[in-house]
Amino acid sequence: KVGGVDVRQYDVEKLREEVAMVLQKNVLFSGTIKENLRWGDPNATDEEMQRVCRLAHADEFIQTFPDGYDTYIEQGGSNVSGGQKQRLCIARALLKKPKILILDDSTSAVDTHTDACIRQALRDEIPDTTKIIIAQRVTSLMDADKIIVMDEGRVDGVGTHEELLQSNAIYREVYESQQKGSVPQ
């Protein structure tokens, strides 16, 4: 259901209006940061853009640019880092005010601290938006209501973080290997 309505009863165009998606390989267009953000909502105010950029932790680097939100982005975002592109694309999706937000490995290019800050902001600021998060980093999923473990295109387990640690060997193995990799030497 989306907005309490069975998705099969939605007009496809109306359903598309309710969904925003941010991919790992995202797209920025030639134009200013403002122009790129307004693809999410052409009528967005400066205040709305600043709010979603705070949620996506894009404001941190935008403020360092001499032209701020009027900074020109090269085709494909070649003049910003991968993590900066991802954060701008998350902000753009948030401007749409979707009922469903799909994040497909969309914070893979940011550090774990920034990833955690973005997840916390999304949890706190848009609690009524359904978030579907596809990630390889277990820390990106730990607080989810439901985690689905996929293996070779098939569902291998469903549950919370704690349930899957107890019941799913694949999830447990990935979690443990990532924990070992994050221990300071």
Regions found by a protein language model. Give the residues of each.
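C-terminal portion of ABC ATPase nucleotide-binding domains
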Residues: 55, 63-68, 120, 127, ...
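A short, proline-enriched helix->beta-strand linker immediately N-terminal to the Walker B motif
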Residues: 95-99, 128
